[in-house]
Every structure is written in structure tokens, then in C-alpha cells.
Amino acid sequence: MLRLFFTILVILLTLPSMGRGICDSDAVENNFKAGDVVMPLTLIGAGTLGFVEPLKNARYEVRDYLNEWRGDHRVTVDDYLQYVPLASIYGLSLLGAEAKHGYIDRTLEFATAYIALGAIVNSIKYTVREPRPDGSANNSFPSGHTATTFMGAELVRIEYGEDSPWYSVGAYTAAITVGALRVYNNRHWFTDIFAGAGVGILSARIGYWMLPYTRRLMHKITGCDAFIYPSMDSQGASLGLSLRF
């Protein structure tokens, strides 16, 4: 997660060489709606209930049941599936889906969301220091894998939900699967998954709420002298860069 976190910082620093899609307006719109925080905060709150009875005891019961049922079997697909919704933020538009924002705006949105996610997840993990159910480390709460994939799923919903609800369904199905596999693999308590999902959704919405401000900031840095555009042919997909002198 830390490597991807620093990659996002690099993207933010290199956007000035990419960017006209953010130069459309000097006006700052307001994307924030108070009701948008209800669901993610509810999920985070549900996750914290794992520290008190009766859910605290229920966590051990679920872990013990799964350990007996699963035996030594483990899967690793969750390590890769967590990134599918994130890749879809760009991949769906290359396949013809209509996104709400252009590539630059989506990158700003994603970068802001991931920075928020990294800050929230790591600050909680290393403050709470909850032991994992398998005893391997003291950073179980909240689930970082789940937060990452739910952030991606929510960004897919924001960007492509108006084009087709099935994009949202697919992304959230992948996210739920990742969360379930984290519990199956004995890497997280089930309440960690609730909290991780809430953090991921909240982070995605922070990226969306902040987009008018990050767009304006990048506009001031870059001016309006360049733009990027996607293209696709029989050889594959690519991004083009056009410069105006």
C-alpha cells in the first residue's frame, strides 16, 4: 500500500505536464452533500462495535468456525482482485463506457482519494494496533485491502453509474468478494471489513468532493497549454499528448 501511496504522490507532481482537462473553469463548484457521509460513517461505526460485546465474542466464533471448516486452505486472489475496481476507473472508458469526468479529473479524484485512504487507514491501524485473527501482526483494524477495493468501487459508481448501473454492480461485487476472502483467509475479523468498506467509500467521496479544488489548483500550476486523449486501435490502447505553443 505504501508503494502505491507514493506513486500517487508522483502522479500529482507530474500532472502539470499532462493537463488541459482541468482548465475548463475558474469557478469552484460544491460537490459535498451532508447525506453522503451517512453510509460510510455507519459502516465504520459498525466496525468499531467489534471491540465490545456481543460482537467481540462473535468475532472469535466466526474465526473458529472458519478455521475448522477451511482447514489449511488459503487463496491469494484477494491480493489481486482488490485492484480490479481501481483499474476499471480508467479501463472502462477505454472500452467505450462514458465516464463522468475526463482522464485528468479522474486522476486527481483518484489521487486525492488514495492519499485520504492512506492517511486514515494507517493512522487507525497503528493507533489501535488490533491483533489479526491469525496472530501475525497488530494492524488488523481496519482492513486495508477492503478499504482499497471499496474506494475503487465507489469511484467506479461515481464515474460510470450514470452510464450503466451494472458497472457499479460489478465493481461492488468484486469489493465484497475481497472483503469476504480477507475473513476466509483468517487475515481479518469480519468487523474489520465493515470499517474498511466505510473508509474506502468515504475516501472515494473525499476525492470527489475535493475535485473542484484540486482541479483549480492544477489549473493554476499548468495553465491551458496541453491536453491528453485516449485512443484505441487493433494494437491496443494508448494515451496521446498534444502541446500548444
Where are each of the predicted segments found?
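Cytoplasmic juxtamembrane regions at transmembrane-helix boundaries
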Residues: 97-111
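Generic short alpha-helical segment signal, independent of protein family or function
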Residues: 85-92, 96, 116
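Alpha-helical transmembrane segments of multi-pass membrane proteins, especially transporters
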Residues: 109-114, 197
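Structural signal for membrane-spanning alpha-helices in multi-pass inner-membrane proteins
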Residues: 47-50, 89, 93, 179-182, ...
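Hydrophobic alpha-helical transmembrane segments of multi-pass membrane proteins
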Residues: 74-77, 107, 111, 143
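N-terminal transmembrane-helix/juxtamembrane module of multi-pass inner/ER membrane proteins
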Residues: 20-89, 125-134
